[in-house]
Amino acid sequence: MKIAKIMVLWAALAGSAFAAGLDASDAGDYVLLDKDQRPTHMQQRYYQRGMQWVMDAKQGDSEWTPVCRGTGECRLQTSPAQKVREWKALLPAELQAMPMACIDNKAFAFCRMSKPDNPNMRLYWWFAWRNGQTYALGLNRVQ
């Protein structure tokens, strides 16, 4: 009986690890993909200042420009589970069962999906809102 309880607890803890929020390993440079999954000239850099996520962006070979500094309406925060479920519903059906963690603000969300059997295999998504519509675009990590 004790072993069964330990196994249930272990399974619950292992499952929650896969659904954990973004962490330092998600920091990096990403190129935004278009709707056909081709790289665009838009790049984004996400990193943490202390516990706060911040974001820089650039077009092509231009210099990085600060975009979200962790204050005001651009402050990136851990996304609520209900919002994450809504965004996942926009993705292909075969991806919707994968755990996803996000940070968001008033304009966009940055999200990571991980395979439960291989958490190092990750997919990144950028969700943006415009005129009442949500757009889901892939991100390729470049650094």
Where are each of the predicted segments found?
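Sequence contexts marking disulfide-bonded cysteines in secreted/extracellular proteins
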Residues: 30, 67-75, 101-103, 110-112
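N-terminal glycine/threonine-rich, aromatic-flanked beta-hairpin/loop signature
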Residues: 38-84, 128-132
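Sec/Tat signal peptide C-region and signal peptidase I cleavage site
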Residues: 15-21
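Short, solvent-exposed loop/hinge segments that bridge or flank secondary-structure elements
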Residues: 22-59, 94-106
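Polar/charged side chains located within well-ordered beta-strands of beta-rich proteins
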Residues: 44, 99-103, 111-112, 124-126, ...
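Sec-dependent signal peptide recognition
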Residues: 2-10
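Extracellular/mature segments of secreted proteins
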Residues: 73-87, 95, 108-113, 117-126
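Edge beta-strand at a domain terminus
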Residues: 70-72, 120-143
